[in-house]
Design a protein with these regions (language model features):
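C-terminal accessory/regulatory regions appended to core domains
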Residues: 1-205
Length: 205
């Protein structure tokens, strides 16, 4: 489990999600500092089964929906609204590989001081070159070359994303090595650069 297997405050059944008990259908009080893996009941790991994540989200979305608690006591209505909001944020974060990587890095780094502006060696110079190239293509409105550049940037982004799994596994094997977390931070920074460049390229229908 992603947490220390707390029990339902009503029936004492071990919880899947910290937000709701599927055994007795009771909303659960939860701590202010709750991590998103606890919310959806998954181990703290970068690798997630996307189908299981979607299924768990839909289950909880239905059970927590405020409409079901419209006639409940005010405290329970508020708990439902808060839990639903947290659920949506948790799902959005864990569903997206980049957001999940950034969130997991935040959990793992704890009080470590990471260089949040670091980039892979040579990446920044390459980005300056690509940015100038993109500026020229946007000025010329060359749709063919813009499309080719979009594909190139997308491939670069996917290559960075492909490194997340082995890097997180490496950290699992060597949790004392802070350099691995710094590598992950650099990869995330690089991917943000690429995303910003991609966002500048007009989409075509």
């Amino acid at each position: 489990m992603a947490f220390d297997e707390p029990a339902c405050h009503t029936c004492e059944t071990t919880l899947v999600s910290r937000l709701f008990c599927f055994s007795c259908n009771a909303l659960q009080p939860f701590p202010r500092e709750i991590d998103f893996f606890e919310v959806l009941g998954f181990p703290v790991s970068f690798e997630l089964n996307s189908a299981e994540l979607e299924e768990r989200y839909q289950q909880l979305l239905l059970e927590l929906h405020p409409d079901f608690y419209s006639s409940a006591p005010e405290a329970e209505q508020l708990l439902s609204e808060t839990a639903s909001a947290i659920l949506n944020t948790a799902y959005k974060t864990l569903h997206d590989p980049t957001l999940r990587a950034g969130y997991l890095l935040h959990l793992l780094a704890e009080k470590q001081q990471l260089d949040e502006s670091s980039l892979p060696e040579g990446f920044l110079a390459e980005m300056f070159f690509l940015q100038e190239e993109l500026d020229e293509l946007l000025d010329s409105v060359n749709s063919v070359e813009l499309s080719a550049m979009h594909d190139d940037l997308q491939n670069r982004k996917m290559n960075i994303e492909a490194d997340y799994v082995p890097l997180f596994k490496k950290h699992d094997d060597h949790p004392e090595n802070s350099e691995i977390l710094q590598q992950l931070q650099s990869h995330l920074n690089a991917e943000r650069y690429l995303r910003r460049l991609l966002e500048r390229i007009p989409t075509t229908d």
